[in-house]
Amino acid sequence: MSNTTRVRKNESLEDALRRFKRSVSKSGTLQEYRKREHYEKPSVKRKKKSEAARKRKF
């Protein structure tokens, strides 16, 4: 999914950048990119999930 932000008439570049950052944050694009940046084996995912559950329990 691509995020497009067009600079409006009489809008500063800083304001347009702020709107773009907000839209990227809301859509979760950056989080998805960071998650997929490196491949994680399913066994490692399960191990991390169980570790997180164990930490929440205590």
Curated annotation (Swiss-Prot):
Segments of skewed composition (Basic residues): 44-58
Keyword Ion transport annotated: no
UniProt key word Ribosomal protein: yes
GO-annotated molecular function: structural constituent of ribosome
Family: Belongs to the bacterial ribosomal protein bS21 family.
UniProt keywords, alphabetically: Ribonucleoprotein, Ribosomal protein
Annotated organism of origin: Oceanobacillus iheyensis (strain DSM 14371 / CIP 107618 / JCM 11309 / KCTC 3954 / HTE831)
Name the record gives this protein: Small ribosomal subunit protein bS21
Chain residue ranges for the region called Disordered: 25-58
BP GO terms, sorted: translation
GO cellular component terms, A-Z: ribonucleoprotein complex; ribosome
PANTHER family: MITOCHONDRIAL 28S RIBOSOMAL PROTEIN S21 (PTHR21109), SMALL RIBOSOMAL SUBUNIT PROTEIN BS21 (PTHR21109:SF22)
UniProt-listed InterPro entries: Ribosomal_bS21, Ribosomal_bS21_CS, Ribosomal_bS21_sf
Ranges annotated as biased composition (Basic and acidic residues): 32-43
